[in-house]
Amino acid sequence: MAEMADIKPTDDILEPSAGRGAIVVALRKYRFRSLTMFELSRENYAVLSGLKLGTALFGDFLKEDCGGFKFDKIVMNPPFSRSQDCDHVTHAYSMLRTPGLLVAIMSEGVFFRETAKARIFRALNPWSECLPEGTFKSSGTMVRSRLVRLEK
């Protein structure tokens, strides 16, 4: 995922649903200008802050616009329940610079559901690749998912 993001030393990066930092830890081997991470769980936020890999912000990413700041790259694994992945990715896309690149893990459902939010997401013309069944079994989930790439 981090490799697909093609991170450059001049990039400002956003991880809007950072959890305990699995994705941002994978970014350690890359050079970039800045990294901003959002987390809604106070416990996870404390873990992120301790990583000292960038700016960890506590709060609901969906209610943020970062003061209009735009990011070159966005890497994310948003929550899937109740189509939250659509909400998170669509909102993150609005914070992407032009040109910019967003790479996300999303549920399979967004690619076949006929809800308004799924249709809005698909209108962004994402590239996607199905991940092997059981990819996240060690994390306690068997949800079918895809690796998604959106360019602006």
PLM regions: where:
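Class I S-adenosyl-L-methionine-dependent methyltransferase catalytic core
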Residues: 1-152
